[in-house]
Amino acid sequence: MRNYDTPVRAIRHKVYVEVAKAGFESTDETLIHDIEAIPYNIVEEKAKYRESIYRERAVASERVRLAMGLSLRPENKAVHLTDGLAASNIDEKYYEPPLMQVIPSACAACPPNKYIVSNMCRGCVAHPCMQACPKGAISMKDGKSYIDQDKCIKCGKCKAACPYDAISHNIRPCEQACGVKAIGSDEQGRASILEDKCVSCGMCMVSCPFGAISDKSQIFQLAHALRGGEKIIAIIAPAYISQFGDDVTPGKFKTALQVLGFSDVHEVAFGADVGAIAEAHHYAEKVATGELPFLLTSCCPSWSMMEKKFFPTMIDNISQELTPMVATARKVKQEQPDAKVVFVGPCASKKLEAMRRTVRSDVDFVLTFEELDAMFDAREIDPASFEEDGSLHDATAAGRGYAVAGGVAGAIEACLKEYYPDVPVHIEHAESLAECKKVLALAKAGKLKGCMIEGMACPGGCMGGAGTNVPVAKSSKELKKFLAGCTKKLPPKELVDIELN
């Protein structure tokens, strides 16, 4: 189970806080010095987690670069920590691909997929492990079972057969978390990301016990822009419920964002309402009539990327409706064309969606809840400390429910039943990339005809995204309570005619 209260997250938080402070406070004269000081502020006098203070500072230095949107430095030549700083010292979006990177000095080169016999082996007479192995890879050595790794095919039958649970399955946590098999190894046995397969969901990042994988952040550039007093509007994903403390209501959260420097705050759930109505209409017009065999949702960018990379023949079945982020951003910019828009959410891969040619002008920055929490700390803002002052009233329970696995399909289904009662509805949904691949394989095989298929890359949906602050079970429970209290349950049918192009 994913753990949120770990030293890895604490270190990431410290880095984000320090980088945010630099964006808010450093001058052109002090910036280089302030950035160079961050690894020393984080790792002071003694190494806590690695063999030396020098290695810990080396890792911290790479984290600082990624937090500023810069790429890792090469290992085979000397490159200064602040190399490239001039290009990233701006008040607008900055991004050097790729989004996800493995920090080599942080990676422990964990053993790859392997079954091994532990000291729990009793050397029993029956040898059920030997009998179960289809390749004859198990023999007896010094009175214990021994697995020949050259013969082993990693089927796991020996482990299942052992009555003492003496055979363990070692697999890299990052590799185990990746549902598209995008984790490989470099020449030194360290993890590497296969860019042709990676869909940037971030599950490898949050699963690595060494914190060796990280995404790039726009926290520095956004702090720079907020400091400059620009008109910047936050659009917040519906998964924000409970992310900043049990006592932080929507009204308090809105106030905290305004104190941080945002001129206004809107719910991305508005765009989800627009999408739910539009996709219900699309389903009724195209899928229910047989014109399309099935329809795939498009709000999760990692799910959409997976379809395009692994199931390219199914691209025409992906919904062409605007994602909630884009629909909300366009609505804001229609009304306030001079404003910059910041998407605040649980998702790492939204950073890539915002870099698409067709989206780049709509969304100026993408910030995760984890990064926003660090920005609050950098400015000593406690969202729970504010008085209740207004709230957020942009959306319905249907749109707000997009945050949980099954919520997208559920909202579309509810709209179909309300506004297209004569149309039969068939819904499928999958959460985690491994499950998403399975459901797409079924669709490709023609076994899901007439279905609206929702896919979420992260277990639990957006509530379990890589940039969240709270365990998915807790946050989903709080969201359910919040939805139950919503007065507006479904978006009006007229939203299908809204112009956001």
Regions flagged by a language model, labelled:
Residues 108-116, 139-144, 185, 203, ...:
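Gly-rich Lys/Arg/Thr-decorated short loops/hinges at beta-loop-alpha junctions or inter-strand turns
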Residues 100-114, 124-129, 155-158, 201-204, ...:
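Cysteine-cluster motifs in flexible loop/terminal segments that predominantly coordinate metals
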Residues 89-118, 135-136:
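N-terminal [4Fe-4S]-dependent radical SAM core
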Residues 1-75, 215-501:
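Iron-sulfur-associated redox domains of electron-transfer enzymes in respiratory
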Residues 74-83, 93-94:
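Acidic, serine/threonine-rich, charge-biased low-complexity segments
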Residues 121:
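Conserved, function-defining core regions and hallmark residues within catalytic/recognition domains
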Residues 85-87:
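Mature N-terminal, pre-catalytic/accessory segment of carbohydrate-active enzymes
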